[in-house]
């Protein structure tokens, strides 16, 4: 706010500023409002504190003035008194309980204000009343920062004596020393250093004291810091030294001092720039550059991008500095990593005078830069005609004819038609740049207007793409072909139709136009682009030409939203309707809708009869506009009669499905309001999903509310019987769920597996949703069993998935529901899926009621935990008195289950901690050792053997008379066989097929019989008993006829034929799977 007129203020304030005590007393006696506010909410007390009249202030305070009143800047009278340096007024305010900690909008206290305004006496009065002198304002500055900033030595000294911290930092980590150095308060700096301040301190960006002093040109501070031993070449966070800073800001006196003190003139920063680079580019760095050059700076030092100081001078056209650099040996054709020389840079930025200097000093005009461009390429690309003229006049190729051979001998310069790495000549660049003067200069110098680049484009293509009317006229007049196609089949007309898109963007500079001027410039360019297109059409450009994808210029205009261009093309094209309605590959209507160009879409909608044409995926333009969320395009299409019920081919989605799935509420509203069908909101896709279901699946609450308000059926089910409520339970969106329940959605609806939303909420762990559903279910059907078709309840699912919050809620809601449904209890589910949290909760809540419960196959939770190798589950179950040797219907204990499944951790725990009984037999008389060997679980078998020396267990036979040794041998468990033999396992025992453990190693019965014959022949019979019972049992089932002989021996006794059964006897008979 500006300066206020005193005559506009209340009489009381006028009397205060007049210092008229009697008038003030008179006004107060007349009940004048003592706390009246001005436009900035200042009270008379603020005015009195500012003026500093103690008697008036006493009158006001005695009359009840608000001592802590705040104005619009939150300044109190105490702040005003401190700013006025009036210690008597400040003392009087303090005596009347003024808040010494009051903060203004910058978080500054009265002490900050006193320090900033050199009010030493005020600061002295305030300091004892504060708990800390280091309180920071909004920028993190303490009172000491402000005192140092003001340069008042006495105040600084006072604050230090009162205990202010020397090294306190603001939010940019700047200490008071930084401000002393920056502002040149040398005496203050000396005082701070004498009190122990750190001379090597740095702020967040690594600026030290020497950097800050150099930045502001504080030469005396710089000299003092150097005398104090400051590191002269210390870099900041960007690698810049104090010399870099001085050169960048043109502080030549500081630069001289630093150089004389031995600063490294060639030290690079993080980007590889030396102080000379910085001096070359800075606004006021001319003297610094001369200083550096005279003191040995390397004029050819290249940055990380390969730029020399001459490159930097060329960027801003520093003519004098470039001359100094050249005179001191700067390489004239030094190339950066892009290949650009200083001449390229000068041409790019249009510095004609510098170009002259460089060329005079021998710069190579034919040197290739970025993309193999000449300097001339860059000059014409950016539209610098004077630079173009200069380069052409001094650098173009010329030749000398030899008088003897009559041959042309190259003398100097470059060929104007030489292409860059992408095949573009200077004429291509000029056409792209849009400067017709450059274009004319090149054409008059012999540039080939029919030359094509690597993409098959002529200069006319580039002129058309940039909407350059004058360049297009010049090129066509000179003979350029208007219908020539590039490698993609695009003619200049295609590019002109989309010219706003292809136009080269202008770089924004400090002197850029404001928004209004920018808009005028854009409008001017749009008009020029339109004239360019019109000119091409008038000069024979064929609008029916298609590119290699089948697109015409109409397609391009629609895709890039150029309404005027589109209207012109539709008007000029003889077969416009055929082009517009063609869906090969995509119609213009689809392109405009997909890209959200509503104006172009409106033009097409007014031209077409049928707006429901579909692309190869069956999508209409309305579908694309809806999917992309272009509400304006949706509005245009629906207003012109486009159907919202046409389905795409894959998922059979309509535009309504697309809008709901993407959350485009406004588009969805327009589609529903089109009134195409009464039940439009319940249209289904290929899976039976309605828009409401998709909106809920993606959590779009606004769409859900809209669909329900417009009549969408809340209980509609898809092909699997799942409703919107099922989906809300899965996603956990409480707002969506509440909306459905408000519209009477049925809570206990079941899908094809009998699962309700309550099941799904429990499985997904959405506690808040589950609570809401349970409350709704009570009012719907309190007697519903709540189990699915497999007998599983929500409690089963919560336990299985480990969602303890949901389980706790279910236990509170229905503590006996664990008895309902499948006998494979929630505890079974928790332990088999390694869910410790829900296991612990179930055991804590139900304990003995559930710990030994059995499923349909007689298995306890301990069996399930063993099967899943869940050691923590086993531990918790045993702690709650689970029966370690309980058997299922097949007679197996938890240990046997673990052994058969190969769960080594469970076997180890049950053996060592659970002390499980190893002698228990199942229905086929298998022990845990039999089962471990039968499945090849070597580690489990060895663990069991390590716990027993019982020969009865080691030689125990099952119903097929097989010992563990038989089974281990048959499965190739060498270490188990060795352990069994070392513990006394018999090798002569035979199973029901007459096989010893050795013969059990055979892969099948026939091999075993052959092996038995060979063994019987190799070992002679004892003399007293030629045919022992062992040999008889060994051979009785060999299957060889008695009449046959072996190796000349007689027929074997009892050699009756016995056909071998391919199926072994069911000695093991394990089901091996816990999956339900």
Curated annotation (Swiss-Prot):
SUPFAM superfamilies per the UniProt record, alphabetical: Ankyrin repeat (SSF48403)
UniProt keywords, alphabetically: ANK repeat, Phosphoprotein, Repeat
Protein biosynthesis among keywords: no
UniProt-listed SMART domains: ANK (SM00248)
Superkingdom field: Eukaryota
Pfam families: Ank (PF00023), Ank_2 (PF12796), Ank_4 (PF13637)
ANK repeat ranges, renumbered to this chain: 7-36, 40-69, 73-102, 106-135, 139-168, 172-201, 205-234, 238-267, 271-301, 305-334, 338-367, 371-400, 422-451, 455-484, 488-545, 549-579, 584-613, 617-646, 651-680, 687-716, 720-749, 753-782, 790-819, 822-852, 857-886, 890-920, 924-953, 960-989
InterPro entries, A to Z: Ankyrin_rpt (IPR002110), Ankyrin_rpt-contain_sf (IPR036770)
Residues that bear Phosphoserine: 1028, 1075
Subunit record text: Protein phosphatase 6 (PP6) holoenzyme is proposed to be a heterotrimeric complex formed by the catalytic subunit, a SAPS domain-containing subunit (PP6R) and an ankyrin repeat-domain containing regulatory subunit (ARS). Interacts with PPP6R1.
The protein's role, per its UniProt record: Putative regulatory subunit of protein phosphatase 6 (PP6) that may be involved in the recognition of phosphoprotein substrates.
Protein name: Serine/threonine-protein phosphatase 6 regulatory ankyrin repeat subunit C
Highest classification ranks of the organism: Eukaryota, Metazoa, Chordata, Craniata, Vertebrata
